[in-house]
Curated annotation (Swiss-Prot):
Species of origin: Acinetobacter baumannii (strain AYE)
Cofactors that this protein relies on: FAD
Keywords annotated in UniProt: FAD, Flavoprotein, Oxidoreductase
One CC-aspect GO term: plasma membrane
Protein name (record): D-amino acid dehydrogenase
Length: 421
């Protein structure tokens, strides 16, 4: 079976790898010069199934209003004048209730836990290296109210069988020794020992090389113009004025998936949520993290690679604007210096990317009303966490194989206005 995968971020490359491993003849098309050159390039680096939490949560509307008046707020909303932005925010607000939160979190954790298992199996099979560590993640609380609020998430972790440890402030240094210097600022933390970390860019490029060895044909610097539709099927994809054909097509264009599907009247509710990161060389390992630390107050993740610290976070709703906002850099630097001042900030590199976010935070993985068009997009901040599982799922769906886990609630069908099948 011939399959064209559109997109070479971590989701697209993982899809191509698993399709090829199961015998498909795969071509990957991308406008960039190589894999992982956009959203997958500089993300925060954590693989955190246990922290797969919907952004649409009870209390978020109130917090969003409060954050509008804070200098180092984790969320910024810049109205871009589009009706789509307002519609997306309204859809998200509809999910900010306990019932929707529970449904969405279960879906997210189902994919994320499966994905971690797939990643471990892939690592065992291929020996792939990407500055990976398996030392867990630690969520930090600066306020007692945060310690109390985390009980809701702990109950979900217990239901899903996820190992965890709730720590007092004076116990944090046992997990992250460098935090012994910051104990007076912290009241406690939630440690998930089974989470992992790694450089998504290195992983995606290494996996692309493995996929090439399986026969995947990567075509970069391509102007992917449109899908050619005939009835309820895709007949081809127009690239640089020419039409390429396959038996089946997988769309993994991230934030750009929605506009690409507009001519097909598939209303994909994926909005670009802008995030930022700093990559900082380590000069003093004693003041650097061992794994990933999540600052609950500022919603910022600080991750250890081999000789670098990756600091990522923020959520900015400003359309497809890729400008670098120095205020966001100041927030990332402030949190890093406060907790782990072991890096050379003068040599830090500043980056931004667009996360493809759905209103319910759950990715869109599965079939459409077009018989040979499949979607693998909308992973938001969890594309790295969910990549391998999503790639394996979509490959099984495309090739009509039985999936390892339930796909209930993952396809575009959950958005009734999208007319999905």
């Amino acid at each position: 079976m011939r399959v064209i995968v559109l997109g070479s971020g971590v989701i697209g490359v993982a899809s191509a790898y698993y399709l090829a491993r199961q015998g498909a003849e795969v071509t990957v098309l991308d406008r960039q010069s190589g894999p992982a050159e956009e959203t997958s390039f500089g993300n925060a680096g954590q693989i955190s199934p246990g922290y797969s939490t919907p952004w649409a949560a009870p209390g978020i509307p109130f917090k969003a209003v409060k954050w509008m008046f804070q200098h180092h707020a984790p969320l910024a909303i810049n109205l871009d004048g589009s009706m789509w932005q307002l519609q997306w925010m309204a859809q998200m607000l509809k999910n900010c209730n306990p019932q929707s939160y529970a449904v969405n979190k279960e879906r997210m954790m189902r994919v994320a836990e499966y994905s971690r298992d797939c990643l471990r199996e892939l690592r065992k099979d291929t020996g792939i290296h990407y500055e990976n560590r398996a030392k867990g993640t630690l969520q930090l609380f600066r306020k007692e109210a945060q310690m109390e609020a985390v009980q809701r998430d702990i109950s979900v972790l217990e239901e899903c069988g996820v190992s965890y440890e709730l720590l007092n402030g004076n116990e944090l240094g046992r997990v992250e020794p460098a935090l012994a210097n910051a104990q007076d600022k912290l009241v406690g933390g939630l440690h998930l020992p089974n989470d992992e970390t790694g450089d998504c860019y290195l992983f995606t490029n290494a996996l692309a090389q493995i996929a090439k060895e399986l026969g995947v044909n990567f075509q970069f610097n391509q102007n992917v113009e449109k899908l050619i539709v005939e009835g309820d099927q895709i007949k081809g994809v127009q690239v640089n004025g020419k039409v390429l054909t396959a038996d089946r097509y997988v769309l993994a264009f991230g934030s750009y998936s929605r506009d690409f599907l507009k001519p097909l009247d598939l209303q994909l509710p994926v909005y670009p949520v802008k995030g930022y990161s700093l990559t900082i060389p380590i000069v003093d390992p004693a003041f650097a993290p061992q794994s990933t630390v999540l600052d609950e107050t500022y919603k910022i993740a600080i991750t250890r690679f081999d000789q670098r610290i990756r600091v990522g976070g923020m959520a900015e709703l400003s359309g497809f604007n890729l400008g670098l906002n120095e205020d966001r850099r100041a927030t990332l630097q402030m949190v890093t210096q406060d907790l782990f001042p072991g890096g050379d900030m003068a040599q830090a590199s500043f980056w931004t990317g667009l996360r493809p976010m759905t209103p319910d935070s759950t990715p869109i993985i599965g079939a459409t009303r077009f018989k040979n068009l499949f979607l693998n997009t909308g992973h938001g901040t969890l594309g790295w966490t969910m990549a391998c599982g999503s790639g394996k799922l979509i490959s099984d769906i495309v090739l009509n194989h039985k999936t390892d886990i339930s796909t209930d609630g993952l396809s575009i069908q959950r958005y009734s206005h999208a007319h999905a099948a």
